[in-house]
UniProtKB/Swiss-Prot annotation:
One of its GO terms (cellular component) is membrane. It is found in: Membrane. The keyword Transferase does not apply. It is a multi-pass membrane protein. The gene is TAS2R60. Pfam families: TAS2R (PF05296). This is Taste receptor type 2 member 60.
Length: 318
């Protein structure tokens, strides 16, 4: 998911790496198709009915940001695979990085706001603050979106400034892409400017996300225990509903965790871009990204209704 791994220094010719890159592209296509369906299904309903539940608005926004992000990363992967010796901060990669930085921040913040919304609306804590937030949160949705746009734009500009300065320094000193001096200058800027900025940008929404997810999973876990004590077993509808909700939340949390770790590992250089372990890690990340939209399709009632209507129309039933 990370765009920073596109800094390559030699041709990717290893057969295993080529196979994994092919798998990555296929997984990205699955993720693009899944997020595209979610965006189209909820987006059409939003346009036609002029109204949509706040959680579904956040969901369609998250699906759209995921769709665009996957498309940008896929284009970047193809470009770097075709031009492995390209300078990491050339104009083409700067343009792609600009889009990636904005969409990446958007994905993190939309995921965070969705977790906040689920936590406040679903969790059954008796603290007065939760009751107050339940009544106020829906009205704050526009401000939540505006805040994401402002924060994402601000951090994207800061990233662009750093990337552009490194490219200007490269042109000024007539450095080769893999010159030792050029690498040291780029490494210094990445270590003391880009990396701290990335960690601040990514950690803020991640911290909020984890707090909300822990509260929400704790609340649902308590409810499921109570339901098990008052029912005959796991086949009861109330227990099944809690299990489905927990599975959806856990998949959401696992995707977010894998996403955040991929960002940190790539920024820290733990997995070198040409190392086989890097491509294995990327395959695992994109497997999560491909599976998550499928889980959403079957856990969201509106999306399930769209799927049923599509099936019935294909079968010729009303």
């Amino acid at each position: 998911m990370n765009g920073d791994h596109m800094v390559l220094g030699s041709s990717v010719t290893d057969k295993k790496a080529i196979i994994l890159v092919t798998i990555l592209l296929l997984l990205r296509l699955v993720a693009i198709a899944g997020n595209g369906f979610i965006t189209a299904a909820l987006g059409v309903e939003w346009v036609l009915r002029r109204m949509l539940l706040p959680c579904d608005k956040l969901l369609v926004s998250l699906g759209a940001s995921h769709f665009c992000l996957q498309s940008v990363v896929m284009g970047k992967t193809i470009y770097v695979f075709l031009y492995p010796m390209a300078f990491p901060y050339n104009p083409v990669l700067q343009f792609l990085a600009f889009q990636w930085d904005f969409l990446n921040a958007a994905t993190l913040w939309f995921s965070t706001w969705l977790s906040v919304f689920y936590c406040v609306k679903i969790a059954t804590f008796t603290h007065p603050v939760f009751f107050w937030l339940k009544h106020k949160l829906s009205g704050w949705l526009p401000w939540m979106v505006f805040s994401y746009v402002g924060l994402s734009s601000f951090t994207t500009i800061l990233f662009f400034i750093g990337n552009h300065r490194m490219y200007q320094n490269y042109l000024k000193n007539h450095l080769q892409p893999w010159n030792v001096t050029g690498n040291s200058i780029r490494s210094y800027c990445e270590k003391f400017y880009l990396f701290p900025l990335k960690m601040i940008t990514w950690t803020m929404p991640t911290a909020v996300f984890f707090i909300c997810m822990i509260l929400l999973i704790t609340s649902l876990g308590r409810h499921m225990k109570k339901a098990l004590l008052t029912t005959s077993g796991f086949r009861e509808p109330s227990v099944q509903a809690h299990i489905k909700a927990l599975l959806a939340l856990l998949s959401f949390a696992m995707l977010f965790i894998s996403y955040f770790l991929s960002l940190v590992f790539s920024a820290a250089g733990i997995f070198p871009p040409l190392d086989f372990k890097f491509w294995v890690w990327e395959s695992v990340i994109y497997l999560c990204a491909a599976v998550h939209p499928i889980i959403l399709l079957f856990s969201n009632c509106r999306l399930r209704a769209v799927l049923k209507s599509r099936r019935s129309s294909r079968c010729g039933t009303p």
